[in-house]
Amino acid sequence: MKRYSRPVAASASAVFLACLASVAGAAPATLPDTAAGRLAGELIHHVNAGNPDQMRRWAPTILSADIAPPEQAGFVQKLVVATRDSGGVDVHDVRTHPRQPGLLQVAVKGRRTGRHALFVMEADPAKPDKLALADMVGMQDPSLYAAWPKGPVSQAELQRLINTTLDRLAQADDFSGCLSVSDGKKTIVDECRGLAERNFGVANDHRTRFHIGSLTKMFTAVAVAQLVEAGKLSWDSTLAQLVPEYPDQATARNITVWQLLHHTSGLGDFFVPEFFQNREQYVDPQDFLDLIARQPVLSEPGKQWNYSNSGYVLLGRIIENVSGESYFDYVQQRVFAPAGMADSGFDAIEDITPNLSVGYFRDGPLAAERKAAWMKLPVKGVPAGSSYSTNADLLRFSRALREGELVKPATLAKMFDDPVPAGPGGYAAGFGERLSHGRHIRGHTGGIEGTTANLAIVWETGAAVALTSNEGPAENWLLAERIADLLAAGTVKP
C-alpha cells in the first residue's frame, strides 16, 4: 500500500528507476539554469543551512497552491527532517525525464547519514517561482549493483552476489528482513539480516513473519478469480450489482470488477486524515464503504490507471457478499490453506501473533532515526494490504498459483490478459508484470511504514524471489527485481 498521491508517486518511482538504471552514464551534477533548477538550488541551499525551523517556514512558499495540502505538508516535513538529520547533502546526479522535459531529478547523498534520496520537481509554467510537483523519495546507493552481471549466473555466484549485497545493506543499517530464492523446484537461497524487534534485540530468522503490504492484493485477486470460476460473478459484474449497500450507486453502476482489479475504476484512496483519526472504526471491508464513497473520483471508470487501495477494499466486500463468508475467513480457507501457507494471515493490532516482526520506519529518506510503525497502520490487515507471511509461504503461493492449485490455468491466463500500462511494465488482475530477457516477471511489491516486500516470479520457469522486511517503505524491493532479472536470463545452475 502506498500512502502518497499516486500521480506524484508514479512519477517519482519512474524517474527513480531511470536514474538508478542509467547511473553508469550519469550527467555532470550541475543544476540547470531553468525554473526548476533554480528552485532546486534554493532548496538544497536551505537543507545545507541546517536550520529546520527556517526550512519549515520557507518550504511552503515555493509550493503551488495546486498541490493538495496533505501532499504539501508531507513534502515539507521530509525537508525539515532532512535539514535536521542529514548534515547537509551533496548532489551526485542531475537529469531531466526523457518524456517530461520539465521534470527535474536531483539525486543527493546525506553527508552525516550517508543515505541517498531523489528530489523530483517540476516548476509551475504559469508561476515559475513555484513548484507544481514536488517529492522526495529514497533511493539505494547507485553503486550497489554496479558489479552485477546482466546474464545468467551460477548458483554459487548468485549466493555470493546476494550475500555481499545484503551484508553491505545491513552494515549501512539499510536492511532488516529475509530474502529467499527458488529455482522453481526448491529453495536455493535463504538469508536473513537485522532485527525483528529492536527493544530486545531479537534477530530475524526463517520463522519470522512479516507484514507484506500490497502483496495482499494478489490474494484478493485470486479469491475473486475463484468466485468467477464458480459462476458467482463475472469480470464485468458491476460494483452496484455486487455491493448494493455502497453509498454512491451512481458511480458504482459504471465500475466493473475488472476495473477494480486493474486500478482503472477511477477511485482514489482511503488513506486520508479521517481514516487515521478514527482507525479503530475501520476493521472489516464494510466499515470503509462510506469513507471511500466520500472521496473524490479521480477519473472516469476504465479511462485511466490510478493505483487504488480503495478499489481492493471494495473487492474484499464483493468477496464477502458473493461467498457469504468474511473476507478474512475466505482467504484463509480458500487461498492460504490450499497453498500450504500455514504461517500467513491477518492480525489485528492488539493480537499476539507468534514470530511476527515489529515494523519500523523513518520520517523521511534522509532521516537518521527509526520509529515503531504502530500508529501508521490499519487496526487490522485489509484486502488491499497488511496481511502477514513468511518467505517460505510466499514461495509456496507462487508454486500453487502457477501449478493451477488455486485457480484453473484458463482463469489464470485471463487474469494476465491485456495488462494496463503502469510503471516499467503493466498491471494485470492483481499482479504487476514486466518482461526481462524475453520472460514474464509477475508478482507484487509492498511498501508502507514498517513494511517493504516483493514477490517476483519468472513465470515461464517458476523461479521466484521473495523479499520481506520490517522496515519501510524502502527501495530494497529492487534487490528482488535484480535477482529476478538474473533468473530470467537463464537457468541458475550449481
Set out the residue ranges of the language-model regions.
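Bacterial N-terminal signal peptides
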Residues: 11-22
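Short, low-complexity N-terminal intrinsically disordered segments enriched in polar/charged residues
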Residues: 25-53, 141-160
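Short solvent-exposed beta->alpha transition segments
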Residues: 41, 49-101
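Short active-site loop at a secondary-structure junction
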Residues: 64, 170-178, 200-260, 299-310, ...
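Exposed beta-sheet edge and beta->alpha loop/turn motif
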Residues: 97-149
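Short, Gly/Ser/Thr-enriched beta-strand-loop segments that form substrate-interacting elements
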Residues: 97-113, 417-458, 466-469
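Short, conserved catalytic-motif segment at the N-terminal edge
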Residues: 153-212, 232-234, 294
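Short, surface-exposed loop or secondary-structure junction motifs
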Residues: 190-197, 250-449
